[in-house]
Amino acid sequence: TLNQPKNDRFIRLRFRLFDDGLGFRYEFPEQKNLTYFVIKEEHSQFAMAGDHTAWWLPGDYDTQEYETVTSRLSEIRGKMKAAVTQNSSQTPIWEGGVQTALMMKSDDGLYINLHEAACIDYSTMHLNYDDKTMTFNSWLTPDARGDKGYLQAPCVSPWRTVIVSDKATDILASRLTLNLNEPCKIKDTSWIKPTKYIG
């Protein structure tokens, strides 16, 4: 629990640990001094232990239609301009911003995936890489006024997820994100069939 005695309010930081990673989120319980509020910023950080190889897409509010770039973390800023290719709807974020899910591999072979789960009535998260501190800072998609969300307690943020494995295929097979998402609200899913889309 994180207390703000000056404002007589608090939030909870909840962690869920799994064999292959963790999730954490912010919980805003109903309380006298916290009812309706605006998210101006989220300050979640992910500190890296090295200059990992990363597979990334440029951070963009409107599209994910970019080719995946492979580079060291320290090269993201330098490769960003070439990575932002023209398409019909794009709003790139900044030179160090990448989209989630972000996949990385350390020099000793550990795969690391940063993403989110249960993103319901909340802004999606991008990551801004700070070359000097080797830290990713969360960056939420804003509205036209720059606000990141309008909430009413009780409510929760999405889960921020970290999945790790010695094998890249284990990241894909992980059930961590599934287990953190809300249960399916569709009672009968028998009509849903897999398909291919090229667009």
Language-model regions, residue ranges each:
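Catalytic cores of extracellular degradative/oxidative enzymes
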Residues: 190
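N-terminal accessory beta-strand-rich subdomains and adjacent acidic, glycine-rich linkers
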Residues: 1-187
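N-terminal small/glycine-rich loop or linker at the start of catalytic domains
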Residues: 193-199
